[in-house]
Amino acid sequence: MRVFIIIIYFRCFSKDHKPYFVITMYESLKNYFFEEIKNDKLLKLPDDFYDDIREYIKNIKDDIELERVKYYFKELRKLRIYKALYLDNERENLLPEELNIIHAIENIVVELKIEETPEFKKPTEIDTPKPIYTINDIDVVKVDKNFPPFTDGTFIYDLNKNDVLSLDRKISHILEKHRIISRIGESYENPEES
């Protein structure tokens, strides 16, 4: 039978042999949370950490403390999962429960990628391009270099290398002059001017 202790004692004694430092489960959870934020790698947590926290949550009487513990618990888990997926490739300090979550996420991603492959797409009719009616003349361009975001006062443009997009002719002319983009395909002019 497993015994759960709500308060973890870490005692330091003063000269008169009286304890002066006690860490509660709440403080322990909070400390783990902030330490996890500070570190790039996953922290080593006790193997039964999540079970202990769940048991602790069942015994909390104070609503405010309950709310805070649930917050730290949820955010700590989200942070650890995020780190495991994106930052820490070794994943050596993951708990078994977290590993199960990671594997479930990875399986879903693999299934979604399989569904997106061309062999699963149904053939459709070949659409013929429709004429584009615009107020301004536009050019279809390919971005040759990454370029920081900019605005023309109406839209915010974020140009990444190898993007293909349509731009207002005035903007495309300036960017083409500086060799940031190159024109491809057709140019579309205002039909009223033609």
Curated annotation (Swiss-Prot):
It comes from Methanocaldococcus jannaschii (strain ATCC 43067 / DSM 2661 / JAL-1 / JCM 10045 / NBRC 100440) (Methanococcus jannaschii). This is Uncharacterized protein MJ0248. It comes from the Archaea.
